[in-house]
Amino acid sequence: MAMALLIKIRGMDFPLDRKYYIENGAHIWLKPEGDIIKIGLDAFAAEMAGSINFFNVNKGRVNRSKAFGSFESSKFVNKLYSPVSGKIIEVNDKVLINPRTINDNPYNSWIVSIKIENKDYESKYIIEDKDEILKWINKEIKKTKVD
């Protein structure tokens, strides 16, 4: 089985077999599987957060660009924003029990699966093109620099 292509930026991996939700500084990856989308935190979010200690996830209906939960790390507490509208049909209990699995491997550690309401969920805030990802992450890195 071939490994999915990815981009490496400053030691952080960004697999090209998924999409990235960038609204509200979300740093959420999406992996569509028919009308189900698995989502998780990307490598940048995991790196910036430091050790992730706790996840709180709401169950049930979610709306695009609205918070569906939060996570707490050694550095801050942050909201989790949904890239799509739909219904959370599965929560990854392994991540709730051991949140640091996201620090170890953010792309094998999905947080929730959402059954989407509308397959036409694409927006300017969901990117998948290699050049768009590079531009976005480099911009995010610059935002974190202290002058």
Spans of model-derived segments:
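Elongated periplasmic alpha-helical coiled-coil
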Residues: 83-85
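Short beta-strand His + acidic residue motifs that chelate non-heme Fe in jelly-roll/DSBH
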Residues: 71, 78-80
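Non-catalytic terminal segments and appended small domains
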Residues: 1-58, 64, 77-78, 87-147
